[in-house]
């Protein structure tokens, strides 16, 4: 690792272990928090505010992760650290072992139970997002992270949009641009429909399910026209009413040219041993008309994931998500950066631990306590990820029907970062932001303090905070870590780490599934790289924090 790649104030806080991947727009490292011993993934985004598009995407992703990060199937953003050059930015995430794209590419590593388990967790995350009237718009295997216990974390919210900020039309909300990966785009997106609904995510989930069942993408189109061609050769042709409902100006002309081509059935694309309930769910998700696709809540009740279904653990938000800056307000890149840095400085002054009451989810305290006591059943560990010790078998929770299926349960972890993102629904926003603030739970006060918006003053404040310690006059003037619990100053003893014999991680390996969209839009990938099977077996288990 080149020392110049990591700013000094970042390396003082996190011990960089190794680089997981590098692309044109960023680097991802595996690291360890020097204070807590927690293993994390640090993503450095190059020129995160190079233009209005990238600045808005960075701002949007951080704000949405703030809203959704309390869900067990959505990646947790632990820390946001501005770079010294005032252009790059560091995002610190919880560490995951691999992504679904890498696992599928290895071939025959997932048993039927693993596929059901993974898809159930994806549906659970999607239901939570949609309950806040947000659509992800970029669900694909590379954005589905996995760990050794087969736990799923949905990531990369840079293209997500809040439907609350857009006018509603006859078929949904009006969105102006869409640049997600082509292979997972819904027909209404390919046909430039003027109205989008949560159905675009359900189509993407259908494509992900089909790819897990088939072992390769269902519709690997090389162009928009070819993508439509592959889709309409497989699913039932739409009716005239369904075409008119899309609100597309030229959908009828395109479909007229494609409707006479030879056809094939969806089950012909899948292996002969595909479970009948999997095929049925796939057909219900890959319906041409968005309003005829299953919703996430309906799909959770489908027989394919019935053994995991437990309504008390399938959370919903109590209110819509509204970003601090209205989606319709186009700020300049420096304005997005200033707003974000103001919020970082404000959070550092008011660092506090998140409370369960602030999560903005409909879940009882008893269910939350039960979720902390249980973990994923060890019988569903995929062989490719079996690098951690097996967990003890816990009691199986009962569902509302009285029988005892296997359930997915993810233990919530705690962390004390210097910059603790506020809990969802805290209602806080930067000074001067337009639009409505997020709805706050009853009894939760919002705090908005004025911060000088100039970059000079912010840089000075940042430089003063770079050592990540401050003096505490009340405790005798000694240094203390802001927002962190006190732990012994001695670092956890590191286990010897074997040097890899070959290149283990590479962003380019999964480029086929990502398509050329990333290069075209000038964005960045949040994939954590591709992991080979032998490399996973050599990954050392880092010790946790000492008592």
From Swiss-Prot:
Record's subcellular location: Cytoplasm, Cytoskeleton, Cilium basal body; Cell junction, Tight junction; Cytoplasm, Cytoskeleton, Microtubule organizing center, Centrosome, Centriole; Cytoplasmic vesicle, Autophagosome
Residues with Omega-N-methylarginine modification: 449
EC category: transferase
Name by which UniProt lists this protein: Mitogen-activated protein kinase 15
Disulfide bonds, paired cysteine numbers: none
Gene name per UniProt: Mapk15
Binding partners and assembly: Interacts with CSK/c-Src, ABL1, RET and TGFB1I1. Interacts with GABARAP, MAP1LC3B and GABARAPL1; controls, in a kinase-dependent fashion, both basal and starvation-induced autophagy. Interacts with ESRRA; promotes re-localization of ESRRA to the cytoplasm through a XPO1-dependent mechanism then inhibits ESRRA transcriptional activity. Interacts with PCNA; the interaction is chromatin binding- and kinase activity-dependent and prevents MDM2-mediated PCNA destruction by inhibiting the association of PCNA with MDM2. Interacts with DVL2. Interacts with CLIC3; MAPK15 does not phosphorylates CLIC3.
Catalysed reactions listed for this entry: L-seryl-[protein] + ATP = O-phospho-L-seryl-[protein] + ADP + H(+); L-threonyl-[protein] + ATP = O-phospho-L-threonyl-[protein] + ADP + H(+)
Protein's job: Atypical MAPK protein that regulates several process such as autophagy, ciliogenesis, protein trafficking/secretion and genome integrity, in a kinase activity-dependent manner. Controls both, basal and starvation-induced autophagy throught its interaction with GABARAP, MAP1LC3B and GABARAPL1 leading to autophagosome formation, SQSTM1 degradation and reduced MAP1LC3B inhibitory phosphorylation. Regulates primary cilium formation and the localization of ciliary proteins involved in cilium structure, transport, and signaling.
PANTHER family, sorted: MITOGEN-ACTIVATED PROTEIN KINASE
Keywords per UniProt: ATP-binding, Cell junction, Cell projection, Cytoplasm, Cytoplasmic vesicle, Cytoskeleton, Golgi apparatus, Kinase, Methylation, Nucleotide-binding, Nucleus, Phosphoprotein, Repeat, Serine/threonine-protein kinase, Tight junction, Transferase, Ubl conjugation
The organism of origin for this protein: Rattus norvegicus
EC number of the protein: 2.7.11.24
Domain Protein kinase span(s) in chain numbering: 14-305
One of the record's GO molecular function terms: ATP binding
Region feature (Requires for interaction with GABARAP, MAP1LC3B AND GABARAPL1): 301-380
Effect of residue 178 to F: Loss of autophosphorylation and activity. Loss of autophosphorylation and activity
InterPro entries xref list: Kinase-like_dom_sf (IPR011009), MAP_kinase (IPR050117), MAP_kinase_CS (IPR003527), Prot_kinase_dom (IPR000719), Protein_kinase_ATP_BS (IPR017441)
Biased composition (Polar residues): 454-465
Post-translational modification as stated in the protein's UniProt record: Autophosphorylated on Thr-176 and Tyr-178; activates the enzyme. Dephosphorylated by PTPN1.
């Amino acid at each position: 690792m080149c020392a110049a790649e990591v700013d000094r104030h970042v390396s003082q806080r996190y011990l960089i272990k190794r680089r997981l991947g590098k692309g044109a727009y960023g680097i991802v490292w595996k690291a360890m928090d020097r204070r807590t011993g927690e293993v994390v993934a640090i993503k450095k985004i190059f020129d995160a505010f190079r233009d209005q598009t990238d600045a808005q995407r960075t701002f949007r992703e951080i704000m949405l992760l703030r809203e959704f990060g309390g869900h067990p199937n959505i990646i947790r953003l632990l820390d946001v650290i501005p770079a010294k050059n005032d252009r790059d930015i560091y995002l610190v995430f919880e560490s995951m072992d691999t992504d679904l794209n890498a696992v599928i590419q290895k071939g025959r590593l997932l048993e039927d139970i693993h596929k059901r388990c993974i898809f159930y967790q994806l549906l659970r995350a999607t239901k939570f997002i949609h309950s806040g009237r947000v659509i992800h718009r970029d669900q694909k295997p590379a954005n589905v992270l996995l760990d050794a216990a087969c736990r799923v974390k949905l990531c990369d919210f840079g293209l997500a949009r809040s439907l609350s900020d857009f006018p509603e039309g006859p078929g949904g909300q009006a969105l102006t641009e869409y640049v997600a990966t082509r292979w997972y785009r819904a027909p209404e997106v390919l046909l430039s429909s003027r109205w989008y609904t949560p159905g675009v995510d359900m189509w993407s989930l259908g494509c992900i399910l089909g790819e897990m069942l088939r072992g390769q993408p269902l519709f690997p189109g090389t162009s928009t026209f070819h993508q439509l061609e592959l889709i309409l050769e497989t699913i039932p042709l739409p009716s005239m009413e369904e075409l008119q409902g899309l609100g597309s100006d030229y959908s009828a002309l395109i479909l007229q040219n494609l409707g006479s081509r030879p056809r094939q059935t969806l089950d012909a694309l899948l292996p002969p041993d595909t479970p009948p309930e999997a095929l049925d769910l796939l057909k219900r998700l890959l319906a041409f008309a968005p309003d005829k696709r299953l919703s996430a809540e309906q799909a959770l009740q489908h027989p394919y994931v019935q053994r995991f279904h437990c309504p008390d653990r399938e959370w919903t938000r109590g209110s819509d998500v509204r970003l601090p800056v209205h989606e319709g307000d186009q700020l300049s890149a420096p304005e997005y950066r200033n707003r974000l840095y103001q919020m970082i400085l404000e959070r550092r002054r008011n660092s506090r631990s998140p409370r369960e009451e602030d999560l903005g989810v409909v879940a009882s305290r008893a269910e939350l306590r039960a979720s902390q006591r249980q973990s994923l059943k060890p019988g569903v560990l995929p062989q490719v990820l079996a690098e951690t010790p097996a967990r003890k078998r816990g009691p199986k929770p009962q569902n509302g029907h009285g029988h005892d299926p296997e359930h997915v349960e993810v233990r919530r972890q705690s962390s004390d970062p210097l910059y603790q993102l506020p809990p969802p629904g805290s209602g806080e926003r930067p000074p001067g932001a337009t639009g409505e603030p997020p709805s706050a739970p009853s009894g939760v006060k919002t705090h908005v303090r004025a911060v000088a918006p100039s970059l000079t003053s912010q840089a000075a404040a940042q430089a003063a905070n770079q050592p990540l310690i401050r003096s505490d006059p009340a405790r005798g003037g000694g240094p203390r870590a802001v927002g962190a619990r006190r732990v012994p100053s001695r670092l956890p003893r590191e286990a010897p780490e074997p040097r890899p014999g070959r290149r283990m991680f590479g962003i380019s390996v999964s480029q086929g599934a990502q398509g050329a969209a990333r290069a075209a839009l000038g964005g960045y990938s949040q994939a954590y790289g591709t992991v080979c099977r032998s490399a996973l077996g050599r990954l050392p288990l880092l010790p946790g924090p000492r008592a």
